[in-house]
Amino acid sequence: MRKTIYNKFDKRAITALPVLKFPGRIIVIMSEGETEKAVDYLLSSDILGVDTETRPSFHRGEMHKVALLQVSTRDTCFLFRLNHTGITPAIKRLLEDTTVKKIGLSWHDDILMLRKRQEFTPGLFIDLQDIVGSIGIEDRSLQKLYANVFGQKISKRQRLTNWEIDVLNDKQKQYAATDAWSCINLYEEIERLRKTGDYNLVVSEEGREISEE
């Protein structure tokens, strides 16, 4: 059965969709010593999903550094608490790796923020915003993309919480892991649709919907 996707997904339709939750293991990395084994484990995977979180700023001129780097395989997500560890040699090795595909969204911005912590040469990263256009999707937010491609909602309730808090709560950990892991799912499905053409694109144009085979 061919999948129906939309060039622009109606944000109002997201509310009624079932919520997506990362079903795997979540491992929080708090110390420099833990980063080496975590990175070795991650780089043994064939693909990784990546994202970052930063403590929100509510006052003019207030800026915070990236507090969390989340990196997920298909079943395990590591949450690197950069506000505790900084960018260790192992984390730098992960970020500079050129052998394993790392999938993110709006990742160019994340790289700029990470490089404010420490300079590094970005390795093999693929930004979903650079490839969704290949199947006719114009939306660029993770929530809209996932709703469009999979019919599930990624909750954003935890986005503006304090990511520098001493102990992340379960909702924060689940949110962070889901964001990184979902990038793998999106990349693999976008690539499948692009290669097979197994989809119908519904184009919304000036209030009209035009189905494209």
Where would I find each of the regions flagged by the language model?
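Conserved DEDDh/DEDDy metal-dependent 3′-5′ exonuclease domain
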Residues: 23-30, 34-36, 43-47, 56-156, ...
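N-terminal accessory regions of nucleic-acid-interacting proteins
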Residues: 1-48, 117, 128, 181, ...
